[in-house]
């Protein structure tokens, strides 16, 4: 389930890139990942500041809208 620090996919697509690793300290607005859907790339930016605690997806993985991409603690 998505918690306060969960960054979720705003749309379905494929993970194009992941810009952070577990332990990365991020600020609001930092790039976390990029999702590609129908040849359009969508940047996923941090909504909260903190430390990346988990990344339950990997590059090339198909995700649905609402899927947790990055957990920030």
Regions found by a protein language model. Give the residues of each.
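Structured functional modules or segments
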Residues: 1-73
